[in-house]
Structures are given as structure tokens and as C-alpha cells.
Regions:
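Non-heme Fe(II)/2-oxoglutarate
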Residues: 1-84, 107-108, 114
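Catalytic core of non-heme Fe(II) oxygenases with the double-stranded beta-helix
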Residues: 78-195
Length: 195
């Protein structure tokens, strides 16, 4: 059985406290993503909590602590735009929604590339990425008419969605005007290894 996504509701025991703390942080990192991010804030208890949900089925988690976005908080507003992409450099990516009362349709979409029929990064027999085909697919990353939505995960407060890093995905339906009423979330990236 292959798992492509995992949803964990009520992730933090104290989401309101987490959110209140996050709202006092500096969102000063701008990059190849919509909105702005904090410095990474991945702590041991969060790692253990995610591991508790995944390790039995997927194996031990390996965290790339030096990844600049691992555990970062990010926010976007209605003026932001995104594109369809994959996070193929790791086995898993995660998004934890932290805006209470957010529109449900402002979650994460999983997409299939219409021309190729692929919904995840193409890999060669040795497991490496088929770079030529991936580049062709990524030429269509910003054109939603080239893609079909195959799954939508709703934006529910304190919900962590973990998905296979090879899946083509995008955030959906930005909202709000600022940090306090925009789409606030935390990002995670990691690998799993069976013993």
C-alpha cells in the first residue's frame, strides 16, 4: 500500500498559544514562494509528534535541520499567487494550517498534468528524477489550464497535511490582507527510512 498523503487534525495541543507566539515573530524571509516566512522554528517536541504519527508505517524520520524552511511559519494574503510544483528533494512535505475560521477551499490542491497524465515527479528506474520530462512539465507550472485537480485538502485550523514530496501540488485561494487575517501556516520537509 502506498500512502501519498496523511492528515492529522488537532496537531498542536495549544494551537492558540502557538499562533499568538508566531504572530510576534519576524516574517522577513522572501524567496521563491508566495508571502513571507520566519526563520526555521523546528523543535524536538514537534519532530517527535510528527514521528509518532508516521514512524510505525513509514520508518524513522530523518530531519534536515539545516534546511532553511524546515519548521518555518509563512503567511500569504489575497494578493499573492502560486504555481504548481513538487518538493521532490525529500520524501515528505507538510503544511500545518494556523488561521482560525479560514475558508475551507484555501487549503492544498494535488494536481495531474493533463498532457502527460502524471500527478507526481517522473523518476527513472534507478530512482533519479527524469529531468527532461520534469522540466517539460514545469514549463506549465504557472498555467492552471494545463492541470486537473485530483484532490483537495481543506484548510482546517490546526490541521497538518503531510504529502509525498513528489506530488504536484499548490496552495489554493489566498485570503486576507495581513499577517493576522491571512493564510498562516507552518512548513515541514523530511525523509523516512525503514529499518
Amino acid at each position: 500500500m502506498a500512502y501519498t498523503s496523511i492528515i492529522i487534525d488537532d496537531f498542536y495541543n495549544n494551537p492558540d498559544e502557538v499562533r499568538d507566539h508566531v504572530l510576534t515573530q519576524d516574517f522577513n524571509i522572501i524567496g521563491n514562494f508566495p508571502g513571507a516566512r520566519t526563520e526555521p522554528m523546528l523543535n524536538e517536541s514537534t519532530k517527535e509528534h510528527i514521528g509518532m504519527h508516521l514512524s510505525e508505517v513509514h520508518g524513522d524520520i530523518h530531519w534536515e535541520d539545516n534546511k532553511e524552511y524546515n519548521g518555518s511559519f509563512q503567511y500569504t494574503t489575497k494578493g499573492d499567487t502560486s504555481w504548481i510544483h513538487a518538493d521532490e528533494w525529500n520524501h515528505w512535505a507538510g503544511v500545518l494550517y494556523l488561521t482560525p475560521g479560514a475558508p475551507l477551499n484555501a487549503g492544498t490542491g494535488i494536481f495531474k498534468h493533463i498532457e502527460t497524465g502524471l500527478y507526481k515527479i517522473p523518476r527513472l528506474l534507478d530512482g533519479t528524477i527524469d529531468r527532461e520530462l520534469t522540466d517539460k512539465i514545469y514549463d506549465d507550472a504557472g498555467d492552471p489550464t494545463k492541470w486537473e485537480v485530483i484532490d483537495v485538502i481543506g484548510n482546517v485550523y490546526n490541521r497538518l497535511v503531510i504529502y509525498n514530496g513528489d506530488l504536484f501540488h499548490s496552495s489554493l485561494n489566498y485570503f486576507g490582507n495581513n499577517l493576522t487575517d491571512g493564510r498562516l501556516f507552518q512548513t515541514f520537509f523530511f525523509d523516512t527510512y525503514k529499518k
